[in-house]
């Protein structure tokens, strides 16, 4: 999570900008805070950030907590902050059958997206099991064992509900 190393990322991005390189921050947003000290450091980072890619795993707070062990309030606060401060963003959603693909979840994300003034892209990322071998090597039970990958029809349905075409042609 790059926001855990905000000072380093700020300096790295500053160097990149001096070289004319576009900067993108890919974040879960779960460390975002409205604390004054945090905000000062965060604003400095945003001064050298061109785009923020924000992963929103679930709109429902209880579901988000179940999936990640964390509240989703900081993530939603970050989305609103980016929109209110004119910072371009992409929102990404991993589509996990039976967990993040309900109509209620997707409509909630769609409604948030409609409010975001700086949203440039809304992506549906189909859940996959490519990293399953890592869990097996660690001898740890995979928490999503037995969950199928979404079908092309599942992804198309989610994209339709989310109205991705409104954002992905910008």
Report residues per predicted region.
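Glycine-centered secondary-structure boundary/capping sites
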Residues: 69-72, 136-141, 166
